[in-house]
Swiss-Prot record:
SUPFAM superfamilies xref list: Subunit VIII of photosystem I reaction centre, PsaI
An example Gene Ontology biological process: photosynthesis
Family assignment from sequence similarity: Belongs to the PsaI family.
Lineage per the UniProt record: Bacteria, Bacillati, Cyanobacteriota, Cyanophyceae, Oscillatoriophycideae
Coiled-coil regions, chain positions: none
Keywords, comma-separated and alphabetical: Membrane, Photosynthesis, Photosystem I, Thylakoid, Transmembrane, Transmembrane helix
Keyword Transmembrane helix part of the UniProt annotation: yes
Transmembrane segments: 9-29
Subcellular locations according to the entry: Cellular thylakoid membrane
Function: May help in the organization of the PsaL subunit.
Protein name, per record: Photosystem I reaction center subunit VIII
Amino acid sequence: MNGAYAASFLPVILVPLAGVVFPALAMGLLFNYIESDA
């Protein structure tokens, strides 16, 4: 696995990660903050 292949393969992992995991994590943290504050 050379550098060019790794660079072309990386967005396939990063796009779902940034589109699904980060918003879900942000929603979870926001929910916990709201619930603990109330």
